[in-house]
Amino acid sequence: DTGPQGPQGVAGPPGIDGAKGDKGECFYPPPPTCPTCPAGPPGAPGPQGAPGAPGAPGLPGPAGPQGPKGDKGLPGNDGQPGAPGAPGYDGAKGDKGDTGAPGPQGPKGDQGPKGDQGYKGDAGLPGQPGQTGAPGKDGQDGAKGDKGDQGPAGTPGAPGKDGAQGPAGPAGPAGPAGPVGPTGPQGPQGPKGDVGPQGPQGAPGSNGAVVYIRWGNNVCPAGETNVYSGHIVESSNANDANGDYLCLPDTHNAYPPQTQNPLLNLKDVTDSYGKTVPCVACLASGRSTVFTFPDNTVCPYGWTTEYVGYEAANPKWPGQNLCVDTYFGDKLSQTPCNNLAVIAKGPLNAYSYQPQDVVSCVVCSI
């Protein structure tokens, strides 16, 4: 059993520095046969020895078990302040003792010389708490010791909090196409889009041209091409034709003789004096349409006047009406005995025409 604590002894003189310990052996890296060397078991605690006289610091032994708390001893007499000793090795932290009675403060001792930096030794057994000495100056930092063996794995810590959400990963590859779903109902019609920009101008088109017959003249207007000139002919029998007129060229082509009776016999159209009526085929470039406006002598706005004349027809049977140029229309009469006669105006419901008035006409192109 542990005896009662004795009175505190007087402070002994400072001990001398211990000899430098041998450098510990460290297996690093571990041998190939030992990927991770486990820590060895702790040594058995040694028995607590009787307090001996202060001697030179011995080699530190393993830490013994903590003994039971002893009875509170009587405060000892204050010892003479000792001379400042050289900084010793850090000892293991002892248990907190009872608060002793404050002793009188001793005189400040002289500052001792600065000792050499010693190597850090193993932790010694906790000594008896001595009298508080005058604080010494901080010693120099010791050299960094070699890395010790890895200790046993600690107990798992509590689960940490969820970290902040990381950035989105790259998009994965497209999955296979799913089956075609049923056709949905037609949605409402969207708003009308804006008018698009005007497209580029197209290539210029070719200049058009139109061919027409100028009845009653053998000369085309200025600037137009004379395709051919001739005279007007018609059927000699009202039963053989529909009353249309032809502009037959003055230069006849040679045709082989017919072995059968001809279907249509032609004859010249004459004026009041028995003269043939001329005609000419004209080519008007840059135009595409030719139209005859009856009972008029002026073309509409934007049209070109080809010639002005009189409306004429065959008085013997109904058929084609011609706009005969005024150059030759003055030579036609209104008598029905002629092959071609001008058309006179008769009384109309909406207008008051005189019987002697003729119907004018104008041929226009655009």
Curated annotation (Swiss-Prot):
Pfam families found in the cross-reference section: Collagen (PF01391)
Basic and acidic residues bias (residue ranges): 138-149
Compositionally biased tracts (Pro residues): 28-45
InterPro entries in alphabetical order: Collagen, Collagen_superfamily
Region (Disordered): 1-207
Localization terms from the record: Secreted, Extracellular space, Extracellular matrix
Low complexity compositional bias, start-end: 1-14, 75-90, 99-110, 150-168, 189-201
Region (Triple-helical region): 1-23, 40-210
Record flagged with keyword Repeat: yes
GO cellular component: collagen trimer; extracellular matrix; extracellular space
UniProt entry keywords in alphabetical sequence: Collagen, Extracellular matrix, Hydroxylation, Repeat, Secreted
Name of this chain's protein: Short-chain collagen C4
Organism taxonomic ancestry: Eukaryota, Metazoa, Porifera, Demospongiae, Heteroscleromorpha
